[in-house]
Amino acid sequence: MQRAALASIVVLLASLAPAFGEAVTPRPIPRLERVEGRFRLLVDGEPFLVLGAQSHNSSASDPAALARFFEGVKALGANTAEAPVYWELLEPEPGRYDFRLVDALVAGARQAGVRLVVLWFASWKNGEMHYAPAWVKRDVWTYRRVVGPGGDEREILSPTCAAARDADARAFAALMRHLKATDEADRTVILVQVENETGLMGTDRDYSEEATRLFRSAVPDELTRYLSAHRGALAPSLDEAWARGGRRNSGTWSEVLGEMAAEAFSAWHVARYVDAVAAAGKEAYALPMYANAWLINPGDERAGRWPSGGPTVHVLDVWKAAAPHVDLLAPDFYQPKVQEIAALYARPDNPLFVPEIALSPHYAAFAFPILARFDGLGVAPFGVEPDGKGEAAAAMEEYARVYRVLKPLLPLVARHQGTGRLHAILQDVEPRQVLRLGSRVALVASFPRPHDLRGPLGGGLVVELAPDDLVVAGCGIDFVARDLEAPLVDPHQWATRQPVLSIDEGTFEGERWVPGRRLNGDERWVRLPEEGAILRVRLRLP
């Protein structure tokens, strides 16, 4: 028995020898980098684009449900999972932490071979406080609630409550310390969402005595200095409200920002609260952190219909001034104006990241412009646990098609973001679209499937490797190439008069092209079928 035990110890020591004998270079911490006016998420020191999959809200509270979630992650072909950690379960009693669910989540991501975005469900979830621990919910004196304009208490922690903020920050710091201790070597976790869809649902601001005193006080100097320093570059609605008040550099919230005062006041205090939580977490483990936004829906007439003070387009600048420890602000998309709103979040001071998008066949192809038009960091549909039926099953299939096309292209896309040589196509109500590639070449796109507000859209991207060498990829698009310097021809001759030398199917391994079939004869068309394809198109340009 002693000899067997000794042999086991020898084997163990031998396995540990490299750790003591050789210096092991640790993986660099994930971080955001700004290069030549564009942002990159670096993972293991290399640009990383998120093809994500987010769980339903409750899946990470139960191992069986979590296993079903990772089945969905695999079925989608995602490279990143997104799932919550719940304050109420992490800290069931003040100062007592239970990390078992956190460990199960990280282990599940490792087993699935994907990276992980941790979503911190704590003081806020959809504009309310559902995930605060029971001991916070019971103690309304210490952890003050928002008061509505009629004097009624709401199920929302007041953003001016220091006790709630500090309790949240302590728990979040404990989570980040645990992640550092257990995941620093593997770097499974690459991003952290601080809270979820913050703001005040059902009221434009907190009308409690303390909050009203602050509302009637002067706007903080940090915000007025920010407004002055960014004059001409502010979000239009905020700039207009400030202009109507004479662009004052001091005064109360109402004096400085007029009709936007209540929402801006809420944004300032919510953002300061979230920033304090993020700062505590970063002190423990400095992963990139973001805050996500419940967007303003068509027909919403005032703050409170959406969570007032969350990082919506109206108040992005307030958040930028108030929350320097929050690396980016991210829209959640459950409405069709994806590109219009994405353009407002893709700012010189904010990269686009879409941590939630509807699990609907209609939304899958938006991944192409998110990555290729707006230089986005990634995208993730919400609720990917498979049920095998209905619209959800159809949506999973459509997202899987899009991800199959995009996944081998990610290194190429990451390298070409921000260069002007990466382009996106997305089907809209027009039957044709023209994509101009410099002054010489145009691609005329048409879509075999009719435009449908609920059904799948044709979408794709084009990478200009050279003026006469294109990567064309996507789902459900037909292209005709035109030489803009050649004589005009009858439209009926377009297909046969293309300046195309060759068309190859294929894929990429890293940035190395691996060719498949050469398409010629009856198949010499630049066609991306519904199931998706990657083509290498070489042009004849004298």
Identify the residue ranges that each predicted region occupies.
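N-terminal carbohydrate-binding accessory modules
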Residues: 22-79
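Conserved, mostly hydrophobic/aromatic
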Residues: 45, 81, 109, 175, ...
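The substrate-binding groove and active-site-proximal loops of carbohydrate-active enzymes
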Residues: 52-62, 84-102, 149-170, 254-271, ...
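Aromatic-lined substrate-binding rim segments of carbohydrate-active enzymes
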Residues: 65-140, 270-284
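Catalytic-core region of carbohydrate-active enzymes that cleave or remodel glycosidic bonds
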Residues: 114, 276-287, 313-411
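Polysaccharide-binding and catalytic clefts of secreted carbohydrate-active enzymes
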Residues: 142-316
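Aromatic- and carboxylate-lined catalytic core of secreted/periplasmic carbohydrate-active enzymes
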Residues: 368-486
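C-terminal beta-sandwich/jelly-roll accessory domains of carbohydrate-active enzymes
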Residues: 445-456, 462, 468-542
